[in-house]
């Protein structure tokens, strides 16, 4: 049967699956199509969260049904899983906590949370897109700051 999975951010995909497919298998397919890690997915049908161990037929999900995908923030997933260590390429939790405090002063709790989540996604995306040239440029600036200063002075004249 054909299903449509729509993320809250607007992305969506169509999938062909058997009616008795496991929710966990569907999440794997969604992961491949929308590039959202399985552990960050929460699938909803008519407002009800789907459990990984159940089958689509257990929820009376039929052909041409539309499922909603909620992408859980990575930090929430890590807390739920009880993981103490953060990902190696993420800034220390203190940085996110500090940013969260600053955002809380300027936004409502819900808006601050959404802004922080988007900032974290943008940060991860930026890191994943760094090229070797970008890394070499950054390293040169850190290792030879005097060269960078000289270049900046030359441009400001």
Swiss-Prot record:
- Which segments constitute the Ubiquitin-like domain? 1-76
This one is known as: Ubiquitin-like protein 4A
Q: CDD domains, per this entry?
A: Ubl_UBL4A_like
Source domain of life is Eukaryota
Q: How does it assemble?
A: Component of the BAG6/BAT3 complex, at least composed of BAG6, UBL4A and GET4/TRC35. Interacts with BAG6; the interaction is direct and required for UBL4A protein stability. Interacts with USP13; may be indirect via BAG6.
| Location of Phosphoserine modifications | 90
* Main subcellular location: cytoplasm
Description of post-translational modifications: Polyubiquitinated. Ubiquitination by AMFR and deubiquitination by USP13 may regulate the interaction between the BAG6/BAT3 complex and SGTA and therefore may regulate client proteins fate.
Substitution effect: residue 123 to E? No effect on interaction with BAG6
Q: Per UniProt, what does mutating residue 105 to E do? A: No effect on interaction with BAG6
Cite the entry's keywords alphabetically. Cytoplasm, Isopeptide bond, Nucleus, Phosphoprotein, Transport, Ubl conjugation
Q: What does this protein do?
A: As part of a cytosolic protein quality control complex, the BAG6/BAT3 complex, maintains misfolded and hydrophobic patches-containing proteins in a soluble state and participates in their proper delivery to the endoplasmic reticulum or alternatively can promote their sorting to the proteasome where they undergo degradation. The BAG6/BAT3 complex is involved in the post-translational delivery of tail-anchored/type II transmembrane proteins to the endoplasmic reticulum membrane.
GO biological process terms held by the UniProt record: post-translational protein targeting to endoplasmic reticulum membrane; protein modification process; regulation of protein stability; tail-anchored membrane protein insertion into ER membrane; ubiquitin-dependent protein catabolic process
Which InterPro entries does its entry note? Ubiquitin-like_dom (IPR000626), Ubiquitin-like_domsf (IPR029071), Ubiquitin_CS (IPR019954), Ubiquitin_dom (IPR019956), Ubl4_C_TUGS (IPR041421), UBL4A-like (IPR047154), Ubl_UBL4A-like (IPR044724)
Subcellular location, in the record's words? Cytoplasm, Cytosol; Nucleus
Q: Name one GO molecular function term.
A: protein-folding chaperone binding
GO cellular component terms? BAT3 complex; cytoplasm; cytosol; membrane; nucleoplasm; nucleus
Region entry Required and sufficient for interaction with BAG6: which residue ranges?
96-138
Q: Where is this cross-link: Glycyl lysine isopeptide (Lys-Gly) (interchain with G-Cter in ubiquitin)?
A: 48
Q: Does the keyword Phosphoprotein apply?
A: yes
* Impact reported for residue 43 to A: Reduces tail-anchored proteins delivery
Effect on the protein upon substituting residue 130 to E/K:
No effect on interaction with BAG6
Species of provenance = Homo sapiens
């Amino acid at each position: 049967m054909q299903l449509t999975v729509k993320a809250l951010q607007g992305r969506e995909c169509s999938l062909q699956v058997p009616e008795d497919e496991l929710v966990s298998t569907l999440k794997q397919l969604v992961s491949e199509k929308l590039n959202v890690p399985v552990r960050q997915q929460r699938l909803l049908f008519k407002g009800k969260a789907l459990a990984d161990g159940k089958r689509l037929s257990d929820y009376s999900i039929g052909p041409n049904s539309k499922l909603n995908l909620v992408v859980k923030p990575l930090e929430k997933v890590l807390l739920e899983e009880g993981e103490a260590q953060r990902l190696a390429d993420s800034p220390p939790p203190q940085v996110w906590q500090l940013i969260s405090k600053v955002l809380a002063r300027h936004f409502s709790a819900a808006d601050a949370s959404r802004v922080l989540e988007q900032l974290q996604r943008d940060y991860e995306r930026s890191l994943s897109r760094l090229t070797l040239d970008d890394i070499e440029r950054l390293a040169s600036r850190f290792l030879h700051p005097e060269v960078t200063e000289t270049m900046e002075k030359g441009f400001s004249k």
